[in-house]
């Protein structure tokens, strides 16, 4: 699976291969290998901190919960230098006083907690351990090079304020090892320094214009 498919796929691999005591039934949905491209765990903080989806979600939550904040941003909006949701998070919120910023942080924390409470039972961060250690599993993520090539812009690799959110925490739960690791590990991961979130499917015009990353991922 890729992206959301990889999030659901991790859960599927964990559940479908559990034995129920009937050989015929066990064989019906049995998987023999698994591949996860750009997955993530801790779904609520993952979405809130996604460079792509996060600004829209944060703006919706905050303006929906505070009429005063909505009014203030409406007045501020003509000054925006970027897209409206990005402006709201990166330009408008930092311009607020410390008390208001603390209230904003509290609202987002409460929302994240409530959303994660609903999603927790279907979050791969909790189900991933169900994938057997001897099951052949392979996963990929885009980490960037720290300079010109950015990390995944949809699913964050890790989140400073949410240690269980993102791709890397899920990789730890899945006990994924680098391809270069020695030993008999069956769970492996590759971390690409170029490419984008959808490079498995098509070249990223910004970070993989030649298509080299897509070719490597697909082969």
Per-region residue spans from a language model:
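Gly/Ala-rich beta-loop-alpha elbow adjacent to hydrolase catalytic centers
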Residues: 1-9
């Amino acid at each position: 699976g890729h992206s959301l498919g990889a999030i659901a796929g991790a859960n599927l691999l964990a559940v479908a291969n559990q034995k129920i005591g009937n050989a015929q039934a066990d064989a019906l949905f049995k998987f023999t290998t698994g591949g996860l491209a750009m997955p993530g765990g801790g779904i609520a903080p993952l979405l809130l901190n996604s460079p792509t989806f996060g600004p829209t979600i944060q703006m919706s939550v905050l303006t929906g919960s505070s009429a005063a904040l909505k009014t203030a941003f409406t007045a501020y909006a003509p000054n925006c230098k970027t897209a409206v949701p990005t402006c709201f998070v990166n330009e408008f919120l930092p311009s607020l006083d410390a008390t208001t910023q603390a209230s904003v942080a509290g609202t987002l924390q409460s929302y994240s907690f409530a959303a994660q409470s609903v999603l927790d039972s279907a979050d791969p961060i909790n189900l991933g351990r169900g994938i057997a250690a001897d099951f052949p599993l392979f996963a990929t993520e885009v980490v960037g090079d720290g300079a010109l090539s950015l990390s995944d812009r949809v699913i964050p690799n890790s989140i400073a304020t949410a240690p269980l959110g993102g791709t890397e925490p899920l990789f730890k739960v899945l006990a994924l090892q680098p391809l270069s690791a020695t030993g008999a590990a069956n769970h492996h991961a590759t971390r690409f320094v170029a490419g984008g979130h959808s490079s498995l499917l098509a070249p990223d015009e910004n970070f993989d214009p030649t298509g080299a990353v897509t070719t490597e991922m697909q082969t």
